[in-house]
Design a protein with these regions (language model features):
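Short beta-strand/loop motif that positions the catalytic acidic residue
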Residues: 324, 330-332, 336
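Secretory targeting signatures
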Residues: 1-33
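Glycine/threonine-rich phosphate-binding loop and adjacent beta-strand/alpha-helix elements that clamp
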Residues: 32-66, 75-84, 93-97, 397, ...
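A catalytic-pocket lid/entrance helix-loop region that shapes and gates access to the active site
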Residues: 188, 213-283, 352-403
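Alpha/beta-hydrolase fold nucleophile elbow
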Residues: 204-216
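Cap/lid segment of the alpha/beta-hydrolase catalytic domain
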Residues: 121-201, 373-388, 514-515, 579
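Accessory cap/linker subdomain of secreted extracellular hydrolases
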Residues: 36-71, 82-83, 91, 137, ...
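A short loop-to-beta-strand scaffold at the N-terminal edge of the catalytic core in hydrolase folds
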Residues: 87-98, 105-118, 127
Length: 626
């Protein structure tokens, strides 16, 4: 028997191994006799009747509409959307059968599946869409695009579609059933994304408003779409999304281990399918074939290339600021190991400075959604989020999305509060207007002064190649704090250094240490920074280094929000590299010059003027075990 209700439809997904818990599938809550038209401030949501016992979050009230049935067992509709590319892009654009009009199906097409609510005749609805490379992708082992993804799609269908939203899933070029090349966020992919947005906004059943949401790669496609400034794109919700590809893989010139291989190795098999036949040949695009060369050259030159087109094509934020007129809701984890938080901070302030309505939700999780207690627990370690669990779990998140999309896509209801919601590493949530905050107090610690040198490395205060291999450090410590010291944002470490060669790199590791215990055993990570000295001025400008000349390395830590408890102190340790970063391509020993010009700069939070709040309390079994 065909499913004839939304709950039954979602239950049917379990039979085809959609990855979602049975408790979530079976959860049905009757609508409360409560007026939820008035927005409840975030600091009062813990008084609302959220179900906090499940593996996902839910809206407070089920919507009135069911899922519109189709002849597909998942009640979806699948279409292929044509779009134009210049022949210079290669792939499908240069396929002779396309160029000579022998077979239009060989021309560039984007694969799209959508679901609609069963609404009264004539009622038009907005569309929430997720765009990425993972739908029906053979190499990733993911379900067909006509099935809602268990990572997000099922939750959207259950919680948001009944409130009058359509939902769509879209495969980027060269993945799933979309032909052409896997372009890794390049021009071809961007054009296909824009074509999908335009198509969704112009259907007769659409009200013309489109919102994009997704995590990781799927959180980067919203930024790509926003570059075009399409009138139909009203809001984006990037979750751990990229503002640029090079920005993902290089920080201050230092290269992540995956950087030289990202395009061809990590995503190299995407787009190839046993069912595509000769369409597999369409992956022969210039950027795809040359991407390893670009990445290798960029590694040699610390993220810089003399031919910049590959990377500038894949940087989004500048064009978003120039063209986009919608809103942005950023979701980011402070401990995201995949997409570092510098994608969100200071991006959020940049958006606000350009008049874009924006908010950010930043908790102490890693590469995850904010409402997944089981994943968050499994992926949290000491100094990497566990001290903020289970307070990090946001069971009000789906309600937050409903209120956001209702205003920006349905154009009704009160405007959501554009609070920046920030969680520190001990679990405290607070509201900020900007982040980093503008009312912070700068506190400086001079290396060799109130940041005391307590341990030299094997060569004194010289950072040298190979320190990581022998676990050697240069260690500094502050005095013990006599109060709870809260700081956050983007701490800075400005070091006077003298490279003994034409390059070199420095890695800084910051810890919270108890005064009454061994920091090596009891200290926890609070943050880190990395720099290739060819970028010692900070930013993206390549610098030439003269061996023996003293320079200032203007290092910036990844975003952090930290509470150092009373009776604890800060330890700062230096060596050549750390985390998952590669050694510099021109390694050299670097002497750290102590004195007033070498400074750790922290931004103390003015906590007395902040609103702190507790989110709905997690009662799911993983939380209760804490």
């Amino acid at each position: 028997m065909r499913p004839d209700s939304l709950s039954a439809q979602i239950f049917s997904l379990a039979t085809v191994a959609i990855m979602i818990s049975s408790s979530y599938l079976l959860y049905i809550e009757d609508a409360e006799e409560t007026d939820y038209d008035m927005r409840v401030p975030v600091w009062a949501r813990n008084q609302q009747p959220f179900d906090t016992t499940q593996a996902y979050s839910f809206v407070l009230q089920q919507g009135p509409y069911s899922l519109l049935q189709t002849d597909n067992e998942f009640d979806s509709v699948h279409v292929m959307i044509p779009y134009n590319l210049p022949e210079s892009e290669g792939g499908a654009a240069a396929d002779p059968q396309c160029v000579l009009n022998f077979d239009p199906d060989k021309c560039p097409h984007i694969s799209l599946a959508y679901w609609r609510p069963d609404v009264p005749q004539g009622m038009k609805v907005p569309v929430i869409a997720e765009i990425g490379p993972y739908f029906g992708e053979e190499s990733a082992g993911t379900p067909d695009i006509t099935q809602p993804g268990g990572w997000l799609g099922v939750s959207v269908l259950y919680n948001l579609l009944p409130h009058g939203f359509a939902f769509a899933q879209v495969s980027v070029s060269g993945t799933g059933l979309s032909n052409h090349c896997m372009d890794l966020m390049g021009f071809s992919e961007q054009e296909g994304i824009n074509a999908a947005v335009e198509w969704l906004g112009t259907q007769e059943w659409s009200n013309g408003n489109v919102g994009l949401i997704g995590k990781s790669y799927d959180g980067s496609t919203p930024w790509q779409a926003a570059m075009y400034g399409d009138k139909h794109l009203k809001t984006i919700v990037p979750i751990s999304g990229l503002i640029g590809v090079r920005e993902l893989m290089w920080k201050n010139g230092s290269s992540e281990a995956r950087a030289p291989f990202m395009h061809n190795v990590v995503y190299g098999s995407y787009g190839f399918s046993s069912e595509k036949g000769d369409e597999n040949l369409q992956n022969a695009c210039q950027d795809y074939l040359l991407s390893t060369l670009h990445s290798t050259n960029a590694y040699v030159f610390a993220g810089n290339e003399f031919i910049e087109s590959y990377w500038t094509e894949r940087y989004f934020l500048d064009r978003v600021l120039n063209n986009y007129r919608g809103s942005v809701y950023i979701v980011q984890g402070f401990h995201d190991w995949n997409v570092d938080p510098h994608m969100a901070v200071p991006t959020i302030n940049t958006l606000l400075d350009h008049g874009i309505e924006a908010k950010v939700l930043m908790g102490q999780w890693d590469h995850d959604y904010p409402d997944r207690p089981d994943y968050q627990k499994d992926r949290s370690d000491p100094g990497r989020g566990s001290e903020a669990y289970p307070e990090m779990v946001r069971f009000d998140w789906m309600q937050d999305l409903l209120e956001w999309f209702t205003y920006y896509l349905q154009e009704k209801g009160p405007k959501p509060s554009l609070y920046l919601e920030i969680q520190n590493n001990h679990g405290e949530w607070r509201v900020e207007e900007r982040y980093p905050a503008t009312d912070s107090k700068v506190v400086e610690f001079g290396l060799g002064g109130n940041l005391t040198l307590v341990e030299e490395g094997g060569f004194g205060t010289i950072v040298y190649p190979g320190m990581e291999a022998v676990d050697d450090w240069i260690v500094f410590e502050t005095e013990t704090f006599d109060y709870d010291f809260r700081f956050g944002g983007l701490p800075q470490l400005h070091l006077q250094v003298t490279p003994q060669g034409s390059g070199g790199s420095i890695y800084a590791y910051m810890e919270d240490c108890p005064a009454d215990g061994d920091c090596d055993e009891l200290g926890i990570h609070v943050g880190h920074a990395i720099m290739d000295l060819r970028y010692h001025e900070g930013g993206s400008d390549y610098q030439y280094i003269v061996p023996g000349d003293t320079i200032t390395a203007k290092m910036e830590f990844f975003a952090m929000d930290v509470l150092i408890p009373e009776g604890h102190y800060i330890r700062l340790s230096l060596r050549d590299i750390g985390e998952d970063y590669l050694p510099s391509s021109n390694e050299a020993a670097v002497n750290i010059e102590l004195g007033e010009d070498s400074v750790l700069r922290l931004h103390e939070i003015n906590f007395k003027n902040k609103i702190f709040f507790e989110p709905p309390v997690c009662m799911q079994e993983d939380c209760l075990e804490e």
